[in-house]
From Swiss-Prot:
LEUTX region as annotated region, ranges: 79-190
Record key words, sorted: DNA-binding, Homeobox, Nucleus
Gene coding for it: LEUTX
Organism: Homo sapiens
Motif 9aaTAD: chain residues: 125-136, 153-161, 163-171, 178-186
Protein name: Paired-like homeodomain transcription factor LEUTX
Length: 198
């Protein structure tokens, strides 16, 4: 076989504890730091920008993999009224991140595209994940249970038709729509008053 010139492979980077601490602190704030932020951090830590970029890329991949594993190891959902507790998982490695969740992109800052994270990073000292993170896990589980649990909402099983509901809740005097003008903006209300005086 013909082998072309071997591509240069960068040796594995070994981070100092102070470098890892600084990288994790930034990861706690955002999983997607701006290029300028990563450049400042790289020069401060005396690392190449490419090393910092790859570190964040690897942490995001690790986080996604952990999320997938958590979704696969969750117990199958039973009836909607049955509740089960979600146990906290702890990772033995001091370098890994655990229980970080991105906020929806609509909430993120449009200028630097940062996604805010709770402070749930494992520290080398063995600090435990914050209570906010564990409450998020249980909230997301509850939401899944609500969405996947009961397929028929309680009101869907009533014997009444929509027309009957309209008759039941129709109050006398609601045919006059001018009473709804109080809910409009003042500008619209003034326009409506001008139209009625003409």
């Amino acid at each position: 076989m013909f082998e072309g010139p071997r591509r240069y492979r960068r040796p594995r980077t070994r981070f100092l504890s102070k470098q890892l601490t600084a990288l994790r602190e930034l990861l706690e704030k955002t999983m997607h730091p701006s290029l300028a932020t990563m450049g400042k951090l790289a020069s401060k830590l005396q690392l190449d920008l490419s090393v910092v970029k790859i570190w964040f890329k690897n942490q995001r991949a690790k986080w996604k993999r952990q999320q997938r594993q958590q979704m696969q190891t969750r117990p199958s959902l039973g009836p909607a009224n049955q509740t089960t507790s979600v146990k906290k998982e702890e990772t033995p490695s001091a370098i890994t991140t655990a229980n970080i969740r991105p906020v929806s992109p609509g909430i993120s800052d449009a200028n630097d595209h940062d996604l805010r994270e709770p402070s749930g990073i494992k520290n080398p000292g063995g600090a435990s994940a914050s209570a906010r993170v564990s409450s998020w896990d249980s909230q997301s589980y509850d939401i899944e249970q609500i969405c996947l649990g009961a397929s028929n909402p309680p009101w869907a099983s009533t014997l009444f038709e929509i027309d009957e509901f309209v008759k039941i809740y129709d109050l006398p005097g609601e045919d006059d729509t001018s009473s709804l003008n109080q809910y409009l903006f003042p500008v619209c209300l003034e326009y409506d008053q001008l139209q009625s005086s003409v």
